[in-house]
Amino acid sequence: MFAIISAGIAPGIALLSYFYLKDQYDNEPVHMVLRSFFLGVVLVFPIMFIQYVLEKENVGGGSFFVSFLSSGFLEESLKWFILMISVYPHAHFDEHYDGIVYGASVSLGFATLENILYLIGHGVEHAFVRALLPVSCHALIGVIMGFYLGKARFSADKARVKWLTLSLVVPSLLHGSYDFILTALSNWIYYMLPFMVFLWWFGLRKAKKARSVNMMQV
């Protein structure tokens, strides 16, 4: 059990540390980052319950509905809601890159508990693939959500609406695409590899842009 928990936690902590330490000028308070991570952990339970009810009540159906609505939109909208009520209005959210840190924190909290539960059910031998695919996917989608929230936080009213909309729509579409590739396509690995390369490129590009804004503010 210790090996499973360690393998389940390690990729999330490693990715969170990476994005946290990239904030070179004004690191966020550790307690705020840990709180966001913990809120992501707690979020697993209501999402599991809602998905269970949707499945039992036969709401929707087919890979598209499950991927883009029951999984993608549901999970990302609740992460977005957590960020909006616990982080977005907070005084510590005072730089564009802060959105990256908090977005990654909530997403990786969710991904870490989900990863542990999966490894308990399927075995620690899946840990490496889990780290490369779902945990990384959650982290990068959280980064992208946080990027757009950072844009919204420091924009005028009209632009703010656009960035807030993108902060929910883009992560939901990316998450839905990941799930659809994984569950609906045969030979999914051939589609997943370029998708993950794109996701890493897109996420790291957004993180770099946010850091450059921070540098101009110093």
Curated annotation (Swiss-Prot):
Regions that span the bilayer: 1-23, 31-53, 99-121, 130-151, 181-203
Pfam family example for this protein?
PrsW-protease
As for membrane topology, the entry says: Multi-pass membrane protein
Protein name (database record): Protease PrsW
- Could you tell me what this protein does? Involved in the degradation of anti-sigma-W factor RsiW. Responsible for Site-1 cleavage of the RsiW anti-sigma factor. This results, after two other proteolytic steps catalyzed by the RasP and ClpXP proteases, in the release of SigW and the transcription activation of the genes under the control of the sigma-W factor. Seems to be responsible for sensing antimicrobial peptides that damage the cell membrane and other agents that cause cell envelope stress. Therefore it is a protease governing regulated intramembrane proteolysis and resistance to antimicrobial peptides in B.subtilis.
Check the record and name the InterPro entries matching this protein: Peptidase_PrsW_arch/bac, PrsW
Q: Which gene encodes it?
A: prsW
Q: Which residues lie on this side of the membrane: Cytoplasmic?
A: 24-30, 122-129, 204-218
The protein's site described by Involved in sensing cell envelope stress is found at: D23, E28, E95
- Organism of origin is Bacillus subtilis (strain 168)
Give the knockout phenotype.
Loss of expression of the SigW regulon.
